[in-house]
Amino acid sequence: MKNKTIITALTVIIASLITYFFVSIKKEYPQLYNIENDVISSVNKVNGLKIIPKIETLEDGKIKILTFNKVSNSISNAVKYANYLWKNEGYYIITNNNFGKENGKVELAKNSSENGKILKVNVNCYTNDSFSVVISLINGSLLLKNNISNN
């Protein structure tokens, strides 16, 4: 009887320790997205989201589609991410189609570290608590014009 009690107590302690270690293991969320030689801050880094997106990689890694599902306040998370890229990482807003509203989207771009390439980011808001980020490396370059004239 005494041996049975000791074995039961040890089993409970071991099971508790195993459960504690599995529960306390932190998931690693990406801090950066890589597209060839370029890096972009991740949504997880910018917004602190604890969601791992569905990731599709196309065109030999030159296009990444990240879909974030079951995100509360998905529109505000999408806006926060796009604003961060614009204000902190040197992206320019190329198009804005009702961004910040359901089914809205924004396209941002900047010159890649690779000559003759553009890094383009599309952030799309959806209606069902989700949003997507499409990152692509395309041929071209941004030529920015100063609209201020000196008269």
What would you call each of these model-derived segments?
Residues K2-I6, L17-N151:
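An acidic-aromatic pocket/loop used at catalytic or ligand-binding sites
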